[in-house]
Amino acid sequence: MNKIKTKCPAKINLYLKVLNKRVDGYHNLETSFQLIDLADDMSFEVCDKDVSIASNKDFLCNTENTVFKSAQKIKSLFKVNDGVKIHINKRIPIGAGLGGGSSNAASTIVALNSLWKLNLSIAELINIGKEIGADVPFFIYGKNSLAKGIGEKLKDTDSIKDNILLIKPNIHNSTKKMFDELDLYRENDNFKTLSLIHI
């Protein structure tokens, strides 16, 4: 097998409770992740040596995005000689809190585990994913989940039964910037609990 195609679903958080900021810069939190039908498409094809990215969105074709970082991390960790050509058909809006970049990274990690015949377990893939981003473990796990820690401690939860109307205003919000601006103490201090979203 030299080529894989995947769907990368978006997610919503039914609630997000930010507990405190850790000394490593991440935040401890509690949340409920739900996968939704909106998805990007990706394809992966083994090639000689290098990692390359093509996309219907030019801003993704660089070495700073989560897909490239994920591929390079796996290639370096496991000393893989092969390269990979990656194509991203982006549908999930960026800056919307829908997890598109994390979903793409998770698909990359899972696909390369198969293409490069690494035979890593889900737990091992999740450990790699959490170094890329806090939401990546959830997308690797691939099930609706309650999450704790930075988002890597996952427990199955039921799917919601109601239909969802998703509205994306023409505003870009950086998740990192929003977390950086929270007024929270670090975990070694007394800390406040702040709920960003509670439905």
What name fits each language-model region?
Residues 2-31, 118-196:
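ATP-dependent small-molecule kinase catalytic core of the GHMP/sugar-kinase superfamily
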Residues 2-81:
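N-terminal beta-alpha supersecondary unit
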Residues 41-43, 85, 137:
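Short, surface-exposed charged micro-motifs
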Residues 71-72, 109, 130, 138:
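Residues within alpha-helical segments
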Residues 30, 84-96:
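Short pre-catalytic strand/loop immediately N-terminal to key active-site residues, enriched for Gly-Thr
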Residues 96-125, 138:
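DPxDG-like acidic metal-binding loop motif
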Residues 76-85, 111-132:
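Phosphate-handling active-site elements
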